[in-house]
């Protein structure tokens, strides 16, 4: 049970401290108060970003606005987590040489005064109240006043007392001392020989063994100077820059990821429709990759921007390699479908047939289907002097038809777009899907039905030839946010332009004539290298239609998610208050094993209808069109609660949907904020402010996945439900940054991008190196979707060279090499693919036997660390730490079926151990564990 009682207030002490603060503010230089200048599987979210050899200077203005400066934890790096105060005004200049400078006393006072002001935010603003405002403020800042090692240190209880006054305007000295002592007891004492870190700016992390020092230069963890002592110890090894190929190109490693998806389809141990589903995923992944990543490469090449990337390759070289590898893989996919999966489906009674294989009765019935269902929605478009070559929409399936006029003898070209409103695979009449077994289902591609009725569309013309083709267009959005008076309107305008992006790929059937192929290449203004030739049918992503049919015996066995016991006890027939459950115990959710609908969705729903709830704040990156989350926020606003939604309308391929329900939220009275200029808001956060008998209490959810009920059934994600005051204060601060002006911020339990996440991780990696060199327990275990950030990768290389064991679980893009002599012998990388898309992010550090574990939304990519608002939360409750430690241990143990990265950069699938015993499927293990928890 988390203590939340209201606390008495030492009024006289508060008055004296307020007077002291006012005196400092009155004499301070006004400039000290100025802000710094500045105004999966299909989840891969293919955001085009700068070449990996460039820095994030293009978004410096946005980062200056988000003046968080979270370079570490509010507590010690050893025992705490969080983010720091921003650098001084000359930080930007000094950062060029890897240094920042502590602010002046007046600036520090201004910062603290700003914190005091923020601490008095109203209940509706979610800053807290009687209990959570005063009590939590005292506790929070008492901890901040304690030294980094967990002892009273330089500031002690008195400092904690003063700081708590600044934050909340009231405190009790004894309570501050007690809380500081409590925190000291939770953090391990610094051992002899502990590494002395680098002093931070006011309000930021101080590493073990460091006392506060005034006006000292701080070394940026991203700089080489920060790692100088480690590099000196590794002088006998070749310098890192002697390994020019230590970074794998991000585009090429993505191709490797999609190859692993294809290998899932090759697995004959899987149900046949599941194999077809993986073929579908492979195709849809490649579509998005070309729409964004390849389109971006082509655009840079056309503009002459082809610098050498971190991988040592330039854009032209990368594009050539992508093209050759993608064509090989699509050829392998087509062969797998034609020679393996398609026959296996037929054997299971699910046949994909063609027109020539039908009997006359079946043809007659399909002709009637064509006349009444298909013909009315077709629009043939001819090309002649009065009809220019038509616009071909991206990812549409089309028929290219060559016609001859029997009177003139002239040939003509026409195009027919197959409508998206009709099924791609038509069930043959008489052989439809029924409950009868064995199955006798026959499906015919829609293009076959249309092709054999072209005489209905072109009466009086001779049909010379017809071929199916498909184009992929550039789907990047280009919105100048700094110049856009209304971001929503600018996005809507750009979405209208996106459909006319340049063609980047043409897919054709292998039966196409050279003439038609060349004609399309010229009209689409592409090259022959952009043409992909495959046997029919094209666009195997539509196999998902067949997978979605009600044929359970040929798919993964259905799993029903469970409700965590803490939320809905077995003894109760009625759903209990989720707030009561959270007060008793922090709840760690693991979706889809734990049901999203009865946990996160229920949390928001109860908040919307609970009369004691005053305010709800939530970030929304992706959600479904009929989202119960959105409906709950609307209902809350209509019931008079203050509701704030931070909506990211730039979420890749969900822009239109997000705009629609953002307007719906606004109409209902929800305060809709579109994030920060230049930054995508990618963190997954919810904050609920509730009036309780002992005052206000704030309830939080921090997750790794989107608030999307549908994808939550297929994505593996983690989430934390808590009313911990440190987390609540951090979320309050972050929401205030996102919705208003709160540039001076510090965090206790969060690491927040773009300011502090990378540096917070770098500091922890260095701490593990130092601990290992001092003979203490040290290891690093990280699970992410992608890793390409060069500074993080180099830090992990340094850890490996120092002897620290590094285990990585990377589902997708992986720019690191492992097992390379002198570079990465101690780095081990696995990749897990299965029925659920592995989407959670876990960062775990040994911390000298006191594991420090974070979960959150951020991957180790430039966009996540530099151009997005991301948040990781430190898990502190011992049983939850133990559970996460067990999970990442399992996934890195070698006991499960997974892909392993080899020193030559290839991936090897391992399904059996050295004795030939079949390895466990980690997702099956977790499904069994979830069921066991609620029995």
Feature locations, PLM:
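N-terminal localization/anchoring segments of enzymes in phospholipid and broader phosphate metabolism
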Residues: 2-4, 10-13, 31, 93-97, ...
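D/E-rich low-complexity acidic segments and tails
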Residues: 4-86, 107-154, 164, 173-191, ...
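Arginine-glycine-rich low-complexity intrinsically disordered regions
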Residues: 88-107, 157
